[in-house]
């Protein structure tokens, strides 16, 4: 989000963060799988419902890299997420893709997501998208 918007419209920041949390909670609920696939299909072309379903919910053998958890929904900047940001920043600097070794402090502002979570009595990570049995896949 742009710094000027953050400074000028904290109400928009809060609304945006609440909408993002609602979206991630919706995604984490397996009861919404059919609706998620419908939304994805409406935004893409050339993919069957089954292919879209498998991309998010499909079960794959461990020998092929399959895991129970398909997507971790951190929502906020957890210690794990912070570590990934720091690692990515160091890598991008090492290949001269960016010109700073560390991001400036205001580049990552966890306070907004943290405030929304506190207001809702929640903690990050907020959920996961887990693999589902093949029997639940669209035909």
Could you describe each region identified by the protein language model?
Residues 86-139:
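Conserved C-terminal helix/tail region of periplasmic/extracytoplasmic solute-binding proteins
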Residues 1-11:
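A bilobed periplasmic-binding-protein/Venus flytrap-type ligand-binding module shared by bacterial periplasmic
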Residues 9-100:
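Secondary-structure end/capping motifs
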């Amino acid at each position: 989000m742009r710094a000027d918007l953050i400074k000028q419209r904290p109400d928009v920041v809060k609304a945006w963060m609440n909408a993002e949390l609602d979206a991630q909670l919706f995604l984490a609920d397996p009861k919404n799988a059919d609706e998620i696939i419908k939304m994805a299909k409406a935004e893409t072309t050339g993919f069957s419902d089954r292919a879209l379903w498998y991309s998010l919910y499909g079960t794959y053998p461990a020998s092929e890299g399959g895991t129970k958890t398909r997507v971790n929904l951190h929502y906020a900047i957890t210690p794990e997420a912070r570590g990934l940001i720091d690692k990515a920043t160091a890598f991008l600097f090492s290949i001269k893709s960016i010109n700073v070794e560390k991001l400036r402090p205001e580049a990552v502002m966890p306070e907004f997501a943290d405030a929304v979570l506190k207001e809702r009595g929640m903690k990050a990570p907020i959920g996961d998208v887990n693999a589902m049995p093949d029997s639940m896949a669209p035909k």
